[in-house]
């Protein structure tokens, strides 16, 4: 064996050579290759190492032995049926041999009584051995002799009780072995939890009779205690006996001595349940804290970032505001706009008051008839046009001048380089003119004032300069920095000078763009075309937009299927400062959204989905919350009349303007609720929604399809088409006026003065009166005034003149008046006759 190598040793023990080498190195042996020799000493060291690593002790395993005994018996029940019950008793005992203690220490520790107890234990051990032998010999005989007496107990234990049924011998059991076994059963601390390891060395019993008897006594006592607790199962009893009852395994949680302060990461919107989870507290505690702060919320309600930060600070933690735009930032940072820069055409927005000639001026420049195509002769969309001039190219954006299109004008100012402010020379500065000036200043865009209609009678250009100077727009002739150009959209006077002024301002701005970069820009308008799907009018501000590019615009994305310029022609690519219609998006983006071209469609979809989820969360967070200060005001909202409207428009910008104008019409008595709004024709879904919500179907420059018309005719819905925003708003106002509660106005029709009072047998007190004002009518409401103080209000019961009942008495005539249910009429009182008139209200 001394010449055995590692390889031979591995094949002998059935181990892999590499694994055996690892174990030998862990044991501290110097073997590294399979050819190294293995001695008997090396094998012994390896065996001791493996024994220790498997939770055993090389010395302790020799001092512990586990014996298992199975005893089978059969008893018959005493109920007369002759039923036999098989009983199997399993016994498992582990014996531990203590290491002998030094005689000197034992002698020093033991006292006189201890020695006496030891002598008694040794004397009683012989008796215990004899009793154990007698018990083992008579076990089966005693079981058969007392089968009928133990049948009930065996059935109660369900024939599987861990305590043996037949183990009830009549031999006397001495009590002393419990005390006598104390010097022998003191085991290592692991004794209460009896191990059952595989591969454990079993040894023969040497002196285990007395200890076995003591274990049986303890086992019996534990069994009696377990039988007293009927709630424990057999499995838990066996587990408890194996684990020693859990008396030594006392575990528990300790309460923190100081409050734990956590750093809570808060996104832009978070639900109450998620916020409580981040702070490791219950959600009802967060709800209570917010209730004390004046906000009543539910567990699933979404709150914004600022509110959540206040709540976290109130709960004693540190808020950490987190931005959720990491994915967007990653996509945007991957786009490079570096390259050779070129001078691009300026983007010019035409703004001004309605009917001041903005579109007509642009029409003359383009040499086309645009205004005649607009309903009512007013612009209701943002039109984007590219004009080639001999001095340079210019891109024009025509914005509406109506008051409802404030948001569209603001978007036009943000997407532009120069603003042309059109002011009629005969009309002067109007509200939308001032608003356009404010938009231009807010966007930091230079102004060029075009004083239009200069050829009309009554034109006063100096008046325009004077009025604009009050708003900070100073002419260059007056020492300012704003160019004023006198033009006429009808005759074309001053058009060239206006274009030269625009190009001059653009040269000063030094407008640059990188045509080789991916395109980016702004969405000017969007609509849902029945044949083409979602169509977005965009203005390219930088880069080049090509057919096939992947575009991310607001909440939507898609691959560009077609590019159509303002002339209706399809093009393959569009450069900077050029307007174009794109097809291929999965929806209609909001007007004013920025668009970019990304390289990866998967990234674009992820960003779009993230924005949609974020938009939904923010919208839910901004909804009206049930706060304490407005609870009472919300209680009376059910009594308010409501006009429900399902609105469909042709383009996104008009839809937004109309929706805002309708919501502004709401009053304290009548609310306008836009139940649903969208771009495109009226469908059957819209009609069904109008039926469910009892709403008016309104189409702005759109029509209903066949299914929608069938539902409208069947249900009798109110469907209205409009092409001018004036008419839409006026008719909604009329509908709201019809829902207003009418006013009742009191109108005094006559006054009579009491001259005398006399008694009538059937009526009672009758006032003899003189009509001093108006006409007194019978069966109308009256008031009795004494010294101009109302003392009674009731009804005129009888009206007579010379014993004749009459219907009315005019001024200057005498009459007798009987007041219903009132007899305290005195001379000098005045009787005032009035009528209630219904007055229709209007907004």
UniProtKB/Swiss-Prot annotation:
- The annotated region (G5) lies at 488-490
**Record-listed GTP binding positions:** 352-359, 398-402, 452-455
Ranges annotated as biased composition (Basic residues):
228-244
Q: Which Gene3D superfamilies match?
A: P-loop containing nucleotide triphosphate hydrolases, Putative DNA-binding domain, N-terminal subdomain of bacterial translation initiation factor IF2, Translation factors, Translation initiation factor IF- 2, domain 3
Region annotation G1: residue ranges? 352-359
**TM stretches of this protein:** none
Q: Which PANTHER family match?
A: TR-TYPE G DOMAIN-CONTAINING PROTEIN, TRANSLATION INITIATION FACTOR IF-2-RELATED
Protein name, please?
A: Translation initiation factor IF-2
Q: Please name the source species.
A: Chromohalobacter salexigens (strain ATCC BAA-138 / DSM 3043 / CIP 106854 / NCIMB 13768 / 1H11)
Q: What is the lineage of its organism?
A: Bacteria, Pseudomonadati, Pseudomonadota, Gammaproteobacteria, Oceanospirillales
């Amino acid at each position: 064996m001394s010449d055995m190598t590692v390889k031979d040793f591995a094949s002998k023990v059935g181990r892999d050579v590499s694994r055996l080498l690892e174990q030998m190195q862990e044991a501290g042996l110097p073997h590294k290759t399979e050819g190294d020799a293995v001695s008997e000493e090396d094998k012994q060291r390896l065996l001791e190492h493996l024994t220790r690593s498997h939770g055993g002790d090389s010395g302790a395993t020799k001092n512990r032995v586990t014996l298992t005994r199975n005893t089978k018996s059969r008893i018959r029940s005493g109920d007369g049926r002759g039923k036999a019950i098989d009983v199997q008793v399993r016994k498992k005992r582990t014996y531990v041999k203590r290491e002998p203690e030094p005689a000197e220490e034992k002698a020093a520790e033991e006292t006189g009584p201890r020695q006496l107890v030891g002598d008694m234990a040794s004397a009683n051990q012989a008796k215990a051995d004899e009793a154990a032998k007698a018990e083992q010999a008579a076990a089966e005989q005693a079981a058969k002799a007392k089968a009928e007496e133990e049948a009930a107990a065996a059935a109660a234990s369900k024939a599987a009780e861990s305590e043996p049924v037949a183990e009830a011998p009549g031999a006397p059991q001495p009590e002393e072995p419990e005390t006598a076994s104390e010097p022998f059963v003191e085991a290592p601390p692991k004794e209460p939890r009896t191990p059952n390891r595989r591969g454990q060395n079993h040894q023969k019993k040497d002196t285990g009779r007395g200890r076995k008897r003591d274990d049986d006594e303890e086992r019996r006592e534990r069994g009696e205690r377990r039988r007293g607790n009927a709630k424990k199962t057999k499995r838990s009893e066996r587990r408890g006996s194996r684990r020693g009852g859990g008396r030594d395994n006392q575990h528990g949680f300790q309460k923190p001595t100081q409050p734990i302060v956590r750093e809570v990461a808060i996104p832009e919107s978070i639900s109450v349940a998620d916020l409580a989870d981040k702070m490791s507290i219950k959600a009802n505690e967060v709800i209570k804290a917010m209730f004390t702060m004046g906000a009543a919320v539910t567990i699933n309600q979404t709150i914004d970032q600022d509110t959540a930060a206040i709540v976290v600070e109130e709960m004693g933690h540190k808020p950490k505001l987190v931005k959720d735009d990491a994915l967007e930032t990653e996509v945007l940072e991957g786009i490079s706009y570096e390259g050779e820069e070129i001078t691009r055409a300026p983007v010019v927005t035409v703004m001004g008051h309605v009917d001041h000639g903005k579109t007509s001026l642009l029409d003359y420049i383009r040499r086309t008839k645009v205004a005649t195509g607009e309903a009512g002769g007013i612009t209701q969309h943002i039109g984007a046009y590219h004009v080639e001039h001999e001095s340079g190219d210019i891109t024009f954006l025509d914005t509406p001048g109506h008051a409802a299109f404030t948001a569209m004008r603001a978007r036009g100012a943000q997407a532009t380089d120069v603003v042309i402010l059109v002011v009629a020379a005969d009309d002067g500065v109007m509200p939308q003119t001032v608003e356009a000036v404010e938009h231009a200043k807010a966007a930091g865009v230079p102004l060029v004032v075009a004083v239009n209609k200069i050829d009309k009678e009554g034109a006063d250009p100096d008046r325009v300069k004077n009025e604009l100077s009050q708003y900070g727009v100073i002419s260059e002739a007056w020492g300012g920095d704003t160019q004023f150009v006198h033009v006429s959209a009808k005759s074309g006077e001053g058009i060239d000078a206006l274009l030269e002024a625009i190009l001059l301002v653009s040269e000063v701005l030094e407008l640059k763009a990188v045509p080789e970069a991916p395109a980016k820009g702004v969405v000017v308008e969007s609509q849902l075309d029945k044949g083409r799907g979602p169509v977005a009018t965009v203005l390219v501000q930088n880069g080049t937009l090509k057919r096939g590019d992947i575009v991310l615009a607001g909440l939507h994305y898609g691959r560009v299927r077609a590019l159509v310029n303002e002339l209706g022609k399809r093009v393959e690519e569009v450069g900077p400062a050029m307007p174009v219609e794109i097809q291929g998006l999965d929806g209609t983006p909001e007007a004013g959204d920025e668009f970019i071209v990304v390289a990866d469609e998967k990234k674009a979809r992820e960003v779009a989905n993230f924005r949609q989820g974020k938009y939904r969360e923010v919208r839910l967070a901004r909804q009206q919350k049930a706060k304490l200060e407005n609870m009472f005001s919300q209680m009376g909202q059910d009594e308010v009349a409501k006009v429900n409207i399902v609105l469909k428009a042709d383009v996104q910008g008009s839809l937004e303007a109309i929706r805002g104008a309708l919501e502004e019409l709401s009053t304290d008595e009548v609310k306008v609720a836009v139940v649903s709004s969208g771009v495109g024709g009226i469908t059957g879904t819209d009609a069904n929604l109008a039926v469910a919500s009892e709403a008016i179907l309104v189409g702005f420059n759109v029509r209903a399809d066949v299914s929608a018309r069938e539902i409208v005719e069947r249900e009798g819905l109110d469907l209205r088409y409009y092409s001018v925003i004036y008419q839409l708003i006026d008719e909604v106002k009329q509908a709201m006026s019809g829902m207003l509660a009418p006013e009742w106005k009191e109108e005094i029709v006559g006054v009579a003065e009491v001259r005398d009072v006399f008694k009538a047998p059937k009526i009672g007190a009758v006032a003899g009166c003189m009509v001093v004002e108006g006409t007194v009518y019978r069966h109308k409401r009256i008031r009795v005034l004494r010294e101009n103080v109302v003392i009674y209000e009731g009804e005129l019961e009888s009206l007579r003149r010379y014993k004749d009942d009459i219907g009315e008495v005019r001024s200057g005539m005498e009459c007798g008046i009987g007041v219903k249910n009132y007899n305290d009429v005195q001379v000098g009182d005045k009787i005032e006759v009035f009528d209630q008139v219904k007055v229709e209200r209007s907004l």
